[in-house]
């Protein structure tokens, strides 16, 4: 029950998330006169702000940083009078219309439609020794923390785009960069693999077919990692270093919506298909876009595209259900 004394704000459309999907949804829905309200969440700009170089954004032949791109999107959405709130939604009820959302400031909101674009968060290895050193030598962001390891030895764990981007970035700061990957081959883009292999002539050292068993350190932080390699005669070996950067993928931020929306492996299920309304969830009026629905492509541009589709789907839903003149 909501007490009558509480002030409840009502909006046609509320967008959760401030990555490429969220901001693109805001731009399109604002142009449709839906007057969207966007909650940035705690991770303003999404995980893209930690990307040092984006070389595949159409129209930008010269690379730009993730922060630059997200600032552009933020400013674009704001210029169209999107109301942007730097808070997080901590509770939702999608079973009643209008939909109810509660922020971390205990402000209540209702909405005719919601677009979920809450993105994903970095995964950790799950080691007991890892959790002790988060912020003390264990990091998930080379752009954020790489500076602290100038002329020191570090490791990057992973084999995808993020891992190779982190390794390449750190190779310009650290003395040595150990790239530890559980497989023998990398899943990153070919151009990144080529650049990384070229850097093996300098200061990137490959440890493929290896897993991290333990992160070793003391009161002053990380001192090394213990790894097990398939082709190692000793099987286990210790690498002395000062920092470990984890880049093994991301998990969608969808916990808030469990028991209300249909999911598979924590990814929100949407209609897809060829008949439109592709971003709708199992609840009409609730749409999802970006990394919360995509475990395959995981690109800024595909997130942005799905944000566009979600806005168009929401516009059609609101127009048909409520008859707004858009």
From Swiss-Prot:
The active site is a redox-active disulfide bond. GO terms for molecular function: thioredoxin-disulfide reductase (NADPH) activity. It comes from the Bacteria. Belongs to the class-II pyridine nucleotide-disulfide oxidoreductase family. Signal peptide: none annotated. The gene is trxB. It comes from Buchnera aphidicola subsp. Baizongia pistaciae (strain Bp). Disulfide bonds join 141-144. Binds 1 FAD per subunit. FAD binds at residues 40-47, 291-300. This is Thioredoxin reductase.
């Amino acid at each position: 029950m909501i007490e009558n004394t509480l002030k409840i704000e009502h909006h046609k459309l509320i967008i959760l998330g401030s990555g490429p999907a969220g901001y693109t949804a805001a731009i399109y829905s604002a142009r449709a006169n839906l007057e969207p309200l966007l909650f940035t969440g705690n991770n303003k700009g999404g995980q893209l702000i930690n990307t040092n170089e984006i070389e595949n954004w159409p129209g930008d032949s010269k690379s730009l940083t993730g922060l630059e791109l997200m600032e552009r999107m933020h400013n674009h959405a704001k210029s169209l009078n999107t109301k942007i709130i730097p808070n997080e939604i901590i509770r939702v009820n999608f079973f009643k219309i209008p939909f109810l959302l509660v922020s971390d400031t205990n402000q209540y909101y209702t909405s005719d439609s919601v677009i979920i674009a809450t993105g994903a968060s970095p995964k950790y290895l799950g080691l007991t020794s890892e959790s002790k050193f988060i912020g003390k030598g264990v990091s998930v962001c080379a752009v954020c923390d790489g500076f602290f390891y100038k002329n020191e030895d570090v490791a990057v764990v992973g084999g995808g785009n993020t891992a190779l981007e982190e390794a390449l970035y750190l190779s310009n700061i650290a003395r040595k960069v150990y790239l530890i990957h559980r497989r023998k081959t990398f899943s990153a883009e070919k151009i990144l693999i080529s650049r990384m292999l070229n850097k093996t002539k300098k200061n990137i050292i490959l440890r493929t077919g290896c897993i991290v068993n333990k992160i070793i350190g003391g009161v002053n932080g990380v001192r090394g990692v213990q790894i097990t390699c398939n082709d190692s005669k000793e099987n286990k070996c210790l690498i002395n270093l000062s920092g470990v950067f984890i880049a093994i993928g991301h998990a969608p931020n969808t916990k808030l919506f469990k028991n209300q929306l249909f999911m598979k492996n924590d990814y929100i299920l949407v209609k897809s298909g060829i008949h439109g309304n592709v971003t709708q969830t199992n609840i009409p009026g609730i749409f999802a876009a970006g990394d919360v629905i995509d475990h395959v492509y995981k690109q800024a541009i595909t997130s942005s595209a799905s944000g566009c589709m979600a806005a168009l789907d929401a516009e059609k839903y609101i127009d048909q259900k409520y008859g707004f003149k858009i």
